[in-house]
Amino acid sequence: MIAEDEWLVVIDRQRVFAESEWSAWACPDGSYHTTDEAFARLAKAFGDRVVYTRYVAPESPQNAWVDYFKDWPQFLVAPDDPMYDLTADTAELAQGHAVVSCDTFGKWGSVLSEAIKGAKKITVCGVATDCCVLTT
């Protein structure tokens, strides 16, 4: 049972991580989509208490990001580039919910805290748990 004061934070369900036909960052062999049904059930169960996040490339990479994007220059694009869009099914579920964009792997910060209204109980879900989910 989900507590009335618990929020769901959905981490980076984006095209760049879903579409392995063109994205080297995508989950291999379309495995991203094996989570679609479970994710949709979870998002619906939380109702209005869901916030979505998007990874976007930093406008001007600094520090470790400089070397990182030497290996991945094709992903150093504007935040509104379609590769950083939420996947279609996620975008549909996200309508009417806050979407927090961050240029870091971890999404925790004041913007996300405000979006979940300072809730102390949260559930975090995403696909690449070894990266953005874990660091959030």
What is each of the regions a protein language model found here?
Residues 129-136:
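Short glycine/serine/threonine-rich phosphate/pyrophosphate-binding segments
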Residues 1-99:
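Active-site acidic carboxylates
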